[in-house]
Amino acid sequence: MPRVDKSLMHEWIEAVARGFGKSLGDISYIFCNDAKILEVNRQFLNHDYFTDVITFDYSRPHRISGDIFISLDTVASNAEMVGATYEREFYRVFIHGILHLCGVNDKGPGEREIMERYEDESLDILTNMIARKK
């Protein structure tokens, strides 16, 4: 897992949520391995496959809250598969969960492309925040 600046991450999540007219509530990240995320996927979603992120949404209309499980194993294999750095893929998956809490879906027709656009825009926000801190 990359070294994470918690205050920068909070600022980033807040900026992304604000772009959707949302404020931050309680958000928990659970970093796990493939075995654990498969267990969660089976138990709660009745899906029998590995995934990179599972989001449980407890949000209210203008305040996002939830539990976000991230498989660090799948993040690593995704990064290798798409030719991205581990760090970039980690942050993409990290914000993917937040985007779900903000109401962005990725299962229906055309939704995957919309999610990817928001992921890219969110990663640009993070890149700009990091550049300003240097």
Predicted regions and their residues:
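An acidic/histidine-cluster motif and surrounding catalytic segment
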Residues: 1-91, 102-134
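Conserved ATP-binding N-box helix of the HATPase_c
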Residues: 99
